[in-house]
Design a protein with these regions (language model features):
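Glycine-rich dinucleotide-binding loop and its adjacent helix/turn
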Residues: 122-171, 176
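FAD-site-proximal beta/loop scaffold in flavoenzymes
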Residues: 129, 134-151, 246-250, 272-322, ...
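A conserved FAD-binding loop/helix module that cradles the flavin
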Residues: 169, 316-355
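Phosphate-coordination loops involved in phosphoryl transfer and adenosine-cofactor binding
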Residues: 5-7, 82, 153-155, 221, ...
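Beta1-alpha1 glycine-rich phosphate/pyrophosphate-binding loop at the start
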Residues: 6-75, 161, 167-200
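A Rossmann-like FAD-binding core segment of flavoenzymes
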Residues: 69-105, 111, 177-301, 340-355
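Hydrophobic beta-strand scaffold positions of dinucleotide-using enzymes
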Residues: 10, 117, 270-272
Length: 355
């Protein structure tokens, strides 16, 4: 298995990670970005950028992200796409190495680094989980269709939730899934008419587009009861429909013991219910760094975590200010702090003449 040695390993290739890489590479620090999927993430799926200084609003988030990545690469950043990080060691006691004290593991290679940056962002779902939701998280349960949708090509999936996010994610899944069961526990027509959503026009356009998709089955006024599965992962979801059904074919068997309960045969469950929001992606951290009560990584003013030489930037910190410009700022601060840390400087160096 290949071993990559570097000064700075960055997990995540969003605006925070790319900005950090730009600065560390300009400081002549060997930098590697490990990116799970370059076309996912909050910025990548944004259709237009209207609030990033100096960027024309006709530019998409993905275009801006590619420019950030290319700029970092111009200064020497090594970019690894489709990187599935599943574990990390963050102290010299764990790595048994006095120089490369951080190790990141993927199925295809190992990265040894002198410093580590966590920039994996967040995905939407906080609040009380449904039975089986946490058990099958990462094994069929997901909060990010744009991250995991391609894994469910020609499969049956369920999307639960009546929010704008649920509608957009369900639309994305129609590109891959055989059938998308869209489950809402409310009357959608009443919800949109009442103006509960902030962007009524956009929501109704997306809603109409979703309902016109041939592979979408909408089950409204339907409750999600449980996610079920086996050792292989999710095999279905148990739902409860109103008398007469919820407006679509169930695709499963009715449970005679409990009238109105139906088991839908699905391989993926994308949940955007009550409490949908931002959940930092920290599953690979294995409790090796301190998190706050909401799951965000705790950092100091230099973006350093509870472990020396490990930094966290962007939405993984779970701040209220989830903006591209804020994520980029985090990346800049972390990079300058890393340069100071690795070179044992007393003061932060403002900029560098790149060699």
């Amino acid at each position: 298995m290949e071993v990559i040695e570097c000064d700075v390993a960055i997990i995540g290739g969003g605006p925070a990670g790319c900005t950090c890489a730009l600065y560390t590479s300009r400081a002549d620090l060997r930098t590697v970005i490990l990116d799970k999927n370059p076309t996912t993430g909050a910025l990548a799926i944004t259709s237009h950028i209207a609030n990033y200084p100096g960027v024309d609003r006709s530019m998409s988030g993905l275009e801006l992200l590619y420019q950030m990545k290319e700029q970092a690469q111009q200064y020497g950043t090594r970019y690894e796409s489709r990187a599935q990080v599943f574990m990390m060691d963050v102290t010299k006691e764990e790595t048994m190495d006095e120089v490369y004290t951080k190790t990141v593991y993927t199925p295809d290679y190992t990265v040894k680094a002198r410093s580590l940056v966590l920039a994996t962002g967040a995905m939407g779902r906080v609040g009380k989980p449904f039975p089986g939701e946490e058990e099958y998280l990462g094994r069929g349960v997901s909060y990010c269709a744009t991250c995991d949708g391609a894994f469910y090509r020609d499969s049956n999936v369920v999307v639960y939730g009546a929010s704008s996010e649920a509608i957009e994610e369900a639309l994305f899944l129609t590109k891959f899934a055989k059938v998308v069961y869209w489950i809402t526990n409310v009357d959608i027509s009443r919800q949109t008419e009442s103006g509960l959503e902030r962007n009524k026009v956009l929501d109704q356009e997306a809603l109409l587009q979703l309902l016109q998709c041939e592979n979408v089955k909408h089950l409204e006024k339907t409750r999600l009861l449980e996610v079920v599965g086996d050792v292989s992962g999710v095999t279905g979801v148990r739902i409860k429909q109103p008398p007469g059904g919820g407006g679509g074919s169930s695709g499963g068997d009715t449970d005679d013991a409990d009238e109105g309960e139906v088991l839908l045969d699905v391989e993926g469950a994308f949940i955007y219910g009550a409490g949908a929001g931002s959940k930092p992606i920290t599953d690979f951290c294995q409790s090796k760094i301190a998190l706050d009560e909401d799951g965000g990584v705790i950092v100091d003013a230099n973006m350093q975590t509870s472990v020396e030489g490990v930094y966290a930037i962007g939405d993984i910190r779970n701040t209220d200010y989830k903006q591209v410009v804020v994520a980029a700022s985090d990346g800049c601060i972390a990079a300058m702090s890393i340069e100071k840390f690795l070179n044992n400087r007393k003061m932060v160096k403002v900029d560098w003449i790149h060699k």
